[in-house]
Amino acid sequence: MKRFLLIVLTLATLVSLFGCNTSEENSIPNNSIEVSEEESMAELIVPPFTKEEIAAHKELPIWPEGNVPYTMDETVPTVVPYLVENAKGCIMVLPGGGYFQRTDKEEGSMVAEEYNKQGYSAFVVHYRYKPYSGDAILADANRAIQYVRYYSDAFGIDDDKIAVIGFSAGGHLAVMTCQHDSDYKIDDAISKESSFPNACMLLYAVTTLGDGTFMGAGNSSMPEIFLGENKDNKNLIDKYSYYNDINAMPDTFIAYTNKDTFVDFEKNSIALADALEDAGKKVVIKEYTDGTHGLGIGAVYADYSKWFGESITFLGESFK
């Protein structure tokens, strides 16, 4: 990203640069010259973290202290960095958990570490969940992307190569970041960055809050948590379902197992893929035949575990 710095060149500087005569008739007045540069002239941004904190995967608060939206307690939304040198791109990891918990290991740190091995930096997003509802959850996810974009130079990533990956309920949140900017705004430089990802990857994802989303042992409380007292409001159900703004979706990778007994893959994964294809959007969809739900990397499953390598292929094509 290019940032601009106003450089004021004094008379003495110009004389030095151009060897000008300093007599009154040949003097050059002071001028303000706007210069665009990538690095040496970039606006000085002092990040609120150190290299040591990054290396230690310290949680980085994404909201200013005392200005966390929709707050009800002392919960501090954060991102956890997993960085590599010369990153091919950046993955924002949204763990699942039905919005009543967050599976930060199996669908968070373990996923980030695997992408590191393939040359991608990653951030695990510690968004809020129950008792918080969708306003806070989406605000955290949007802000996390903006935060990483704003400090992209310090993180050593390309701010045009940021993908979001979501598992189960985290998949729903991933889709929402592609279609919605948070209604909550604060007046700071970070909030001026785009909150939309450049690519989207979904694993056994919930993509709609409508009827039939869940099956068997599925967590039917998820719409109630996300929408709160408005859980039966059809307008809001539609707003926070994949079909709300299908044309806003970036390149999308969808993977699921046909043994899933929690989330109805036909009404979520397949329905989203069909809508993307109908809209002429790029979509890659993969169906696997083993495992059930909540698998994360799922290395022990011969078929399902192929998703990770296929996601790397997808990223390589999307981040050309």
PLM regions and their residue ranges:
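N-terminal cap/lid segment of alpha/beta-hydrolase-fold proteins
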Residues: V35-N86, G134
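Mobile cap/lid helix-loop segments that gate and shape the active-site cleft of serine hydrolases
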Residues: E65, A205, L209-N244
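Short beta-strand element of the alpha/beta-hydrolase
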Residues: K88-G97
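Catalytic nucleophile-loop/oxyanion-hole region of alpha/beta-hydrolase
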Residues: T103-K105, M110-A112, F123-D159, A299-K306
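Primarily recognizes the serine-hydrolase "nucleophile elbow" in alpha/beta-hydrolase
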Residues: R143-G216, I237
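Short beta-strand/loop motif that positions the catalytic acidic residue
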Residues: F253-D260
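C-terminal catalytic histidine-bearing segment of alpha/beta-hydrolase fold enzymes
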Residues: A255, I270-K320
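Conserved alpha/beta-hydrolase "acid-adjacent" motif
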Residues: T261-I270
